[in-house]
Amino acid sequence: MTDILNKILATKAQEVAAQKAAVNAEHIRALAAEAAPVRSFIDSIRGKHRLNLPAVIAEIKKASPSKGLIRPDFRPAEIARAYENAGAACLSVLTDEPYFQGSPEYLKQAREAVLLPVLRKDFIIDEYQVYQARAWGADAVLLIAAALEQGQLERFEALAHELGMTVLLELHDETELEKCRNLTTPLWGVNNRNLRTFEVSLDQTLSLLPALEGKTVVTESGITGKADVEFMRARGVHTFLIGETFMRADDIGAEVGKLF
């Protein structure tokens, strides 16, 4: 199986270089400083937990490398409103264009349509992208342990926190724990999809739970309905990042509602 992650990261490096040439670092920092006030991503999740509800991070995703086009009828603002009305805690918006057909415009449209906090879902490899996320209005950023070295994880987390954003740290297996040991974010995601093969197993989250005691654990990928949610909640996981299941639904709001 081709190492998909390495291919994505190589493309991302070229993309970031082009973006820096178009909008220099000083300007992107200024735009980040002028952005709308941050909405607390982690507080929104904890608010659902206090009500004994699953906290759903609902994803706005048009396509993926493994599945191709997922939702042809793709209207980010409309999708965001459906998610908010159905009880989602937060939004996740893909901004990667080459592999996920995402766009910063989708993030902006979604955030303007609702009051929910929004995560920039992308492959962050440079501090420029952290400033960029805030400039676009993101309230949180994803840091993928498999894509970054320890020093990068620590620098990017510190910068995100300095800008007021929540960090969702994404792990896949126990080999990534050591380089994350100094991170302070309370929000630790486990991607049930192996980013090197794109195969999915909920066992990934379960296998890491003992090492993540005291963290707010987010299970990502492979959650297909209420049975999966109840299965994970019975094992102490109450936060769910879900995209494809919702994106394939004719009635997105109704699909989200089935989880509660």
From Swiss-Prot:
By its UniProt entry, which Gene3D superfamilies does this protein fall under? Aldolase class I
GO BP annotations listed:
L-tryptophan biosynthetic process
**Pathway info:** Amino-acid biosynthesis; L-tryptophan biosynthesis; L-tryptophan from chorismate: step 4/5
Question: Does this entry carry the keyword Oxidoreductase?
Answer: no
The family database entries (InterPro entries) matched by this protein are listed as: Aldolase_TIM, Indole-3-glycerol_P_synth, Indole-3-glycerol_P_synth_dom, Indole-3-GlycerolPSynthase_CS, RibuloseP-bd_barrel
Keywords tagged on the record: Amino-acid biosynthesis, Aromatic amino acid biosynthesis, Decarboxylase, Lyase, Tryptophan biosynthesis
Catalytically driven reaction(s): 1-(2-carboxyphenylamino)-1-deoxy-D-ribulose 5-phosphate + H(+) = (1S,2R)-1-C-(indol-3-yl)glycerol 3-phosphate + CO2 + H2O
Q: What class of enzyme is it?
A: lyase
Question: What Enzyme Commission number(s) does the record list for this chain?
Answer: 4.1.1.48
Can the keyword Lyase be found in this entry's annotation? yes
* An MF annotation (GO) of this entry: phosphoribosylanthranilate isomerase activity
Superkingdom, according to UniProt?
A: Bacteria
Q: What family classification does the UniProt entry report for this protein?
A: Belongs to the TrpC family.
Listed name of the protein? Indole-3-glycerol phosphate synthase
What lineage, starting at the top, does this entry show? Bacteria, Pseudomonadati, Pseudomonadota, Betaproteobacteria, Neisseriales
Which gene is transcribed and translated to give this protein? trpC
